[in-house]
Amino acid sequence: QFLSFSDSRGEAAFFASYMTAAYSEFLRRRGIWHVVEKNKENMAAHPWEIQHFVDELTSYFDSCRTFAEPGDKGVENLTATSRKNAWIAVLNEMVNARRSTSLASLGILKFNYKGNAEEIMSGVAEAYQQKVEDVKALFDLLAMEIVYHGALEGDCDLTDDEREYIFYTPKPKRVKRCKDMDKDKKKSYLAGWSAAIRKNGSLLKNGRLKRVMSVLNLDEASANELLQMYWDEVLRGEESLSTAGNDEFYFSTERFT
């Protein structure tokens, strides 16, 4: 009815486009819920690699012909379409996991960075006289902040429109160890991991620095040193960030379960 009686063709077109995107997102989220519900015991006992989750979601979309075009007769091979939508679904849930309406916030999913190994977290906890579970929770959140920023890539080629949908910009997001306040000033796509340093030598606090200071009861210099150490030893360690050149990095989904 809206499309029939709208005073503006532009508004009608926007509404139709919005409803199509919203329905596609609903189908993707429903697919994730179905796969998790069917496999939750196995996933809890043996956390799945992101690639495996995408494969299972692809199979579900394929078997249901979820993204078939209107008039589909059931003969067209939809695997490529199913796989693209599976990747969009998973990337979207990872990047938006802190939203109150995300499947992670609803307790259906949880993404874990593989670099925060138990022995590393135990060492940090001992060094700073903290509980291991508190340290693990802190660094799990800090690693996910890179994902929330959007410095994340999966094993798929995304169009500009798809990137806009997931990351809110077609330009790939990136992160670096420490942003240069002059050279990187206009790079809105780029996040700094540790605090930037002002010309007078003082630190420009970011959210990560404040969080480390609060949880571990550290002064800003010690907290920033720990962030830089974590970058060097963990984020650039065995489960490393991937390089995009120019000292800019991103997470591959291979680093998560």
Q: Where in the sequence are the language-model features?
A:
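Charged, low-complexity interaction segments
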Residues: 1-257
